[in-house]
C-alpha cells in the first residue's frame, strides 16, 4: 500500500479552499447575460468554446492533491445540479463557493462546524419553502420562450424554437437536438406515432416521387407472429376489400408467398396493402404493438391470448386517419383510439418509468410515452463552423432542460432575485437556530443567497454592493437587468429562472458545502519517487554497444 500524506485542521481547510476557489473562479466568469466564454483545450481536434458551467468544471484537475480534493467536491455540486435540472450549474458553484468561504471563516473563528452545518441546513429548508411560494406556473409558450432564451444566454431564436417545439409535440413529447447541415436552425416535427421500421417491399410504393407509401384512412392489422401463409390472411383481405379501404399490416415479419400475394394484389389494384415489421424486439416488441393497438383502437392478434388470424374480423383492426411509410420509418397519424384508454396506457408506462432501474430502460419507456402522448420534434442546430456548432448545441440542450424544468415546477424571477427575496423573507420571519453557532450558519447561508446576483453584476462590470442593496430594498420581482443595465420587474422583462433549477442549485450547493465545512482531516497518496527507477532504466542505454558482439 502506498504511503499517505495527511493534513489536519486549518492546513487541510486552507488547501481545500484554494482548490474550491480555482474551480469556482473559472466557472463563475460564465454567469449572467454578460458572462464570458471559457476555451477548453482538447488533446485532439480544435479547442471547445463554452459558456456552460458544468463543462468548465469537468475539465479541471489540479496538480496538488489536497487542492484537487476541494475542486472535485465542488465539481460534484455542478454535476448534481446538471443531473437534477439540466441547468443552474454555475449558480450552484457560486453558491457553494460562498457558503464554503464564509463557513470556513466561522470555523477559523472558533465556531462548532456541526452546528454551522445544522444552521445552513435550516436556512436552506426555509428558502426552498419560500421559493415554492414565489413560484408561478409556466404554461404559455411566451413564458417557455423566455426561459429558453435566458438559459441559452439571451439567444431569443433558441427560446422561440423550443417554445414552438413544445407547442407542437406537447409537454410530454420528445424533443431532440441534432447538428444541422446549414447555417440556420431548423425545427422538424413528426406528429403521430413514428417507429423505425420501413416497408417490406418497394412494390408497395404508391408515391414514386417521394419513394414512400401513403395510406388514407387505412385499417391496421397488428399480429404478434410471422405471416408466411396467405390462407390465414384471406378472410381479413376479403373483408377489407369489401370495405374499400387500404390495409397496413404490422407483424413480426411477412415473408414468402404471403408477401408475394400481397404485392400482386396491390399492383393489380384489388386491395391496397402495405406491410412493415413490428418495432422493437422480444418483450419490448409486444409492448409497442400494444401501444399501437391502444392508439388505433385495434387488437393485437396473438396466439398467446387465443386469437388467430383466420378468425380476425374488421372489429379487431385498428384505424387511423393517415399512414406514411418510407424506407426506414412508419408514421401513424391520428389514430382513432379512445383518449381515456391512451391516457391510461401512458399512466401505466409512467409507473414503469418510476420502477425502472437502468437509464436505458427509462429512456425507451419515455420514448413510448412521447409517441403515445404527443409526438417527436427535432431541433437541428445550424452554424458556420464546427466549433460554433458544438458550443451552440450545448446551449440549446441546456435551454431545453431549463424549459422542461420550468414546465414541471414553475418559474421565479431570474437574475438572482428569487434567492434574495427568499433570504429577505427568512430574515423577516426571524428564523433562529438552537444556539449561537447555528445562527451564524443561518447567516452564512443567507449571505450566500446574494452571491449569484453579485456575480452577475460583477461579470457585467458594475458595482455589486450598490446594486445588491438597491435590489434588496425593492420587493416582489423587482431586480436588475444586467443585459440592458436597468432596474425593473424581472418577470415583465422576461427574465425568468425555472424554480427547479434555482432550488436544486441551492440544495446541492448547501449539501456539499456543509460537508466540506465539517472536514477536519484530509488524506491522500504521497507522490511516488520514481527518480531511482528512471536512472536504473536509463543506465541500460549503454547496451547499444552490444551491436558489435555480432
From Swiss-Prot:
EC category name: isomerase
One Pfam family here: Cpn60_TCP1
Keywords tagged on the record: ATP-binding, Chaperone, Cytoplasm, Isomerase, Nucleotide-binding, Stress response
Effect of residue 2 to P: In strain: WA / Serotype O:8
InterPro entries with a match to the protein in the record: Chaperonin_Cpn60_CS, Cpn60/GroEL, Cpn60/GroEL/TCP-1, GroEL-like_apical_dom_sf, GROEL-like_equatorial_sf, TCP-1-like_intermed_sf
Swiss-Prot/TrEMBL catalytic activity: ATP + H2O + a folded polypeptide = ADP + phosphate + an unfolded polypeptide
EC number: 5.6.1.7
GO CC, one annotated term: cytoplasm
One GO-annotated biological process of the protein: protein refolding
Any one GO molecular function term: unfolded protein binding
Subcellular location: Cytoplasm
Domain of life, source organism: Bacteria
Protein residues bound to ATP: 30-33, 51, 87-91, 415, 497
Main location: cytoplasm
Its biological purpose: Together with its co-chaperonin GroES, plays an essential role in assisting protein folding. The GroEL-GroES system forms a nano-cage that allows encapsulation of the non-native substrate proteins and provides a physical environment optimized to promote and accelerate protein folding.
Subunit structure: Forms a cylinder of 14 subunits composed of two heptameric rings stacked back-to-back. Interacts with the co-chaperonin GroES.
Family that this chain belongs to: Belongs to the chaperonin (HSP60) family.
Protein name according to UniProt: Chaperonin GroEL
Biological classification of the source: Bacteria, Pseudomonadati, Pseudomonadota, Gammaproteobacteria, Enterobacterales
